Amino acid sequence: MSDILKNINSVNWKSGTTIYKIGDEADFAYLLEKEEVEVLSKNSVRVGFINEKEVFGEQSILLNTKRTVTIKTTKDSVAIKNSQKKQSL
């Protein structure tokens, strides 16, 4: 448990920040604490939103794949990120 906690950090983003994009290596999973982020597919087509208290980025970590969507902030946002690639629970 202490290994998990030492790898958790808070991160703040300004509106319009790209958190990750399609094809990026999967290095972090996130828990959105404040505001929302948009999910974009190829050609920047919006396919959804991630809201407060939702997790994102975990699928690519668990499947050991590159990012399949782009995530971008719509407002100034805050999240918790876990910096370990894979965790055993």
Please identify what each model-predicted range represents.
Residues V47-L89:
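Cyclic-nucleotide recognition modules
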Residues M1-L40, E52:
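Regulatory nucleotide-sensing modules
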